[in-house]
Amino acid sequence: MRVRRCAIVYLEPRERLGFDLDGLLAGGDGTVRRQQWLAHAPHLDAPVPIDAPARECLGQLSAALWVDAACLAGWPEGVLDWLLARGLALAEAEGQSAIADTRLREDYWWGPAAMFHRAGRWSGEDAAAATEAAGLATATGLRQHLGPPPPAVAERCSEEGRLRLPRGQASDFDDLLRRRTTCRNFDPARALPILLLARMLERAFSAQAQWRLDTDTVFLKKGSPSGGGLHPIEAHLLVQRVEGLAPGAYHYHPLDHALEPLPAPAMPIPELARVAVAGQHWFAGAQVLVVLAARFGRCFWKYRQHPKAYRAVTMDAGHLSQTLYLAATDLGLGAFVTCAINEVDIERELALDPLGEAALAVCGFGWRADAMHNAEFDPAGRTWATPMA
């Protein structure tokens, strides 16, 4: 059997402080320090606690070259089997960990980006409940518990030293920008006409043109910019209330301007919508939710193990969400975007590979409700006449 180390692994000395009453009574300060080494490998679902012998042996393995296990006879007994069982060392015969590790290598991930991406994923989180329980659901609660925030504006000189610029004459586009706001109140009963759904998808995600170098090398032109012109973000829809369209999961085809029905998720769509946005019920009721899923291999094909590539992909998601906002505002619809999502649950339900095509954010759009039951940030009162709570 030949073995090697996984492609990417980082070691963390994690420290936890606790209180020990006996230590305090004995004359100490009562502080107990507990330290544990963790191995973080982005092809694994969770960090692995690791002891000193395993840590040292793991560092001796090459991540690139296979070595015969017989050459490791001098290792402490059981260490190689322990590393193999946990996916930190890999045997040449493929297992599940080896398949995920191969995906990392083939898609040219930059190590720190892969680590960041995998470590920040949620499963089963209810961000809304946690925020409310902590008293952080309102601006008043935020300030009360966290103190005042840093200033809203960074100032680099005195007021007298600023060079005032002329204000432009407002146009229809200026009005559109001023009306753009995040919707937290969707109509729970009204269905969206399929023509509006089609218009939204066409504006936000469709390919306006394409350029072919060869049959296997195609570049798309869309309404939003993309790093390297590669457009790695895919739109996966959770349709809840659209006239003439069955509720379910769909993938949008940007060239054909068509929906591709996906296998039915195990969760009912309304439940999946709420889980997807981590319990943010004010978003979960949108007529249509859009999972922005990144095909990292599309971007990393050009930007191989590049320190800026992951940042470019996340910027793409931001560009698309703003285009979706403006399209919705122009059509009289509400819209939202959130990165507080349960990626693990989304990817499981939609059969997405967390390293190959992973959820980065969830957008949504649809009809606004007649009344504002959930507070919205609309200080100028362009959407609601009701003052902010």
Where are the regions a protein language model picked out?
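N-terminal accessory segments that position/regulate proteins before the catalytic core
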Residues: 1-280, 287, 349, 353-389
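Hydrophobic alpha-helical transmembrane segments and adjacent short intramembrane/lumenal linkers
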Residues: 264-298, 305-307, 312-314
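Extended hydrophobic-aromatic, low-complexity segments
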Residues: 261, 300-302, 335-336, 373
